[in-house]
Amino acid sequence: MASSHSSSPVPQGSSSDVFFKKEVDPTKHIRPVQSLPDVCPKEPTGDSHTLCVAPSLVTDQHRWTVYHSKVNLPAALNDPTLAKRESDFFTKTWGLDFVDTEVIPSLYLPQISKENFIAYQQEISQREKIHERCKNICPPKDTFDRTLLHIHDKSRTDLEQVPKIFMKPDFALDDSLTFNSVLPWSHFNTAGGKGSRDAASSKLLQEKLSHYLDIVEVNIAHQISLRSEAFFHAMTSQHELQDYLKKTTQAVKMLRDKIAQIDKVMCEGSLQILRLALTRNNCVKVYNKLKLMATVHQTQPTVQVLLSTSEFVGALDLIATTQEVLQQELQGIHSFRHLGSQLCELEKLIDKMMIAEFSTYSHSDLNRPLEGECQVLEEERLVSLVFGLLKQRKLNFLEIYGEEMIITAKNIIKERVINKVSQIEEIDTDVVVKLADQMRMLNFPQWIDLLKDIFSKFTVFLQRVKATLNIIHSVVLSVLEKSQRTRELEEIPQQRSAGKDSSLDTDVAYLTHEGWFISDAFSEGEPASAAVDTTSQRNTSPHSEPCSSDSVSEPECTTDSSSSKEQTSACAPPGGIEIIVSEDMRLTDLELGKLASNIQELLCNASDVCHDRAVKFLMSRAKDGFLEKLNSTEFIALSRLMETFIVDTEQICGRKSTSLLGALQSQANKFVNRFHEERRTKLSLLLDNERWKQADVPAEFQDLVDSIADGKIALPEKKPVVTEERKPADVLVVEGHQYAVVGTVLLLIRIILEYCQCVDNIPSVTTDMLTRLTDLLKYFNSRSCQLVLGAGALQVVGLKTITTKNLALSSRCLQLIVHYIPVIRAHFEARLPPKQWSMLRHFDHITKDYHDHIAEISAKLVAIMDSLFDKLLSKYEVKAPVPSPCFRNICKQMTKMHEAIFDLLPEEQTQMLFLRINASYKLHLKKQLSHLNVINDGGPQNGLVTADVAFYTGNLQALKGLKDLDLNMAEIWEQKR
């Protein structure tokens, strides 16, 4: 059968010895070995099989196969299509030594011989002999297996004849579908004429079912015959088992009788003693319970007494202890069924009393007269209140204190204003009713004194708030420290109890008829030392009554919960009062840490409140533009006062408040804008009225410049009038250099120093002042350029013309400002934070603009002479007399130019200017000579020109400061090519 080839129920041969050969059954199906295809296939002969084996050029042309001669060395060597074998296939490419070279054996591989297997053969020979002997004794398994396989296949074939519906586990004839499948009534017809056929079909169906039954019975009989030995063995074992059970029941009955006798003789008396001990302990418990009830009954009167003395913490501890006893020890006592709710209401009442008490304390503490030392009011009372509020988790008491702070800050300003106004007789309070209007009637000295008084009161107020909050903060930290220490102590007993529980779990507990465990009786009778250990950890309220003097009932006086949870200890806060920190006060570390941070935040809020009230006070005074009308001295005094208050509050609170600082910055910005506009307007008026003539330099300006040279960038202090007055100088001497300047520049230097001094007095406006100062310097540069170079002064001032002297004077003024720009830059750089140093680039831009302006003025002076040379030399003729009128006129104009600028400009600049003028002169002269065809040939015309040039050179070098000037007049002649 086909199934016999797929699986075999009997193992084929033994696999116990892997070293022995197995006999292979020749009848078994062996898969034929497929030979590799021939390298050189035969020519197709029409056989289909041959065609299938051979490669296909169509299908295999893109797939690599062994038929590719490119990669198949044997195919390349044995190719029959070649005309001849190439014997020198390798040698012709790789040399003659390629074929004859022998492969050297590996040094790491040993030589294996038969001697290496001798030890293995000796070891295995004995086992091989035993195996051969056993194989001869035992019958061959192949025959047995073949027989069983044949029988199995036959029975399986018979069973396959039975329909599958009979083999289903849910086979039931009461199912209509199953019944119709087994008995197909559709084949039977009760109508006449077909009765004989129906009878035959019925008979045939009955025979078929009988045949199926026979097959099943034969298979069942066969299976029973195969397992008959196991059935007989089971029946025999059943009889033996019944005999064993009968003997066992008899032995158990005898054992029970003996145990009953032993129990009666040896155990009943001892158990009776234990029962009596349990009864006695129960009586003691009832007695202690009654005493505890008597103590609890006195709770409410005791709480009333404690509240009358403001002992909130003690009353709360007593209520908490009583609540714990009611929930554990006295649970279910009918007479105390309402006591728990009464204590809860009493606890809520205490909460309200503590909050009201804290509010009263806050009002009393913050509204004390702001004189004297900053001591805490009734420190012990504060500590007691804070502990009570923490115990009840009433953490909003800081909000009450914060609200009281706001009210107090408002009252401080109101009281100070009323006090100040009442001292001034000029203010009629009956006419001016509003307090703000009365305050606005104060002049600046009176108002600044009032502000100073308010700031001093605010400072004392903040110091008192800080002292009070420090006490609260220390209480919170003590509770936090105690909580952490208690948690560490609780972890140690838990670790010990874990070890004890593991040993107690193995003990045997005997249950009596009363439902008690004997182990309970032993635990009740533990030595007194253990009881003392437990009571030593308990701590009741100091106002609770003692339990009893009975030593027997002492361990039962307090509850188990008090011994396990209410471990309290006395802590000493800064107030000196000892407050008990109970387990009930179990705020988490997160809550306590948050509360501590809120306390610090409340102190900062107090500072913010003071700053906010001060800002409102300033704004109410600034409504009529009072602050904007302050001069520099007054505003600096106000700014310093406000900055001092900001620093003082920052030292107290540890954080800088921004509201007053912002108000100061806002007023400072307004002051800076007004300050700058005033000076810009002043500079504009000075420039519009400047006639650009050299001005005398008063002695005070020379002193101002000298102080700048000494490193003091500030306006000099006003000195008393001296009878001896110094005469003004012609020029301004700056570090040994003389500067001829106009009056506007002198005042501009003073204005610049005012900007620098304002930065020193008000550091917060440094950046704004830098921007405004650069704007002022740019304005001076651009406006002076418009007036002088652009000839705007002709219309503004009414000058007839812009002379070379005006130009030189303007250039020298610009040079003076350029000289002081690095000094100003260094002054601002020292006062700017490093991150704002980028703003200093404005000074570099201004310096470049000034240098460009100076260069334009120099170019303008050269252009004036250039136009003169062009006009005069264009009419020049080479003829007598010598020197010619043209050259006389040129020398005259050069002398005037020198006289105009020499006393104004430095000698080096004058020389550079005349070198440029001389270059322009040579260019025009060369052009005219070229036009006249005068060359350097030594002729008469050349002599005349040489004489004129010598006259020009002599006159120019005779001018002051131009003696050593290299004129290089040979350049006027055309170079010969």
From Swiss-Prot:
Q: Which Pfam families does this UniProt record tie to the protein?
A: Vps54, Vps54_N
Q: GO CC annotation: what is one? A: mitochondrion
Q: Which InterPro entries match?
A: Vps54, Vps54_C, VPS54_N
Which cysteine pairs make disulfide bonds?
none
Tagged with keyword Membrane? yes
Q: How does it assemble?
A: Component of the Golgi-associated retrograde protein (GARP) complex, also called VFT (VPS fifty-three) complex, composed of VPS51, VPS52, VPS53 and VPS54. EIPR1 interacts with GARP complex and mediates its recruitment to the trans-Golgi network. Interacts with VPS51 in an EIPR1-independent manner.
What disease does the Swiss-Prot or TrEMBL record associate with this chain? Defects in Vps54 are the cause of wobbler phenotype (wr). Wr is autosomal recessive and is a spontaneous mutation discovered almost 50 years ago. It causes spinal muscular atrophy and defective spermiogenesis.
Entry similarity comment: Belongs to the VPS54 family.
Summary of the function given for this chain in its UniProt record: Acts as a component of the GARP complex that is involved in retrograde transport from early and late endosomes to the trans-Golgi network (TGN). The GARP complex is required for the maintenance of the cycling of mannose 6-phosphate receptors between the TGN and endosomes, this cycling is necessary for proper lysosomal sorting of acid hydrolases such as CTSD. Within the GARP complex, required to tether the complex to the TGN. Not involved in endocytic recycling.
What's the protein called, per UniProt? Vacuolar protein sorting-associated protein 54
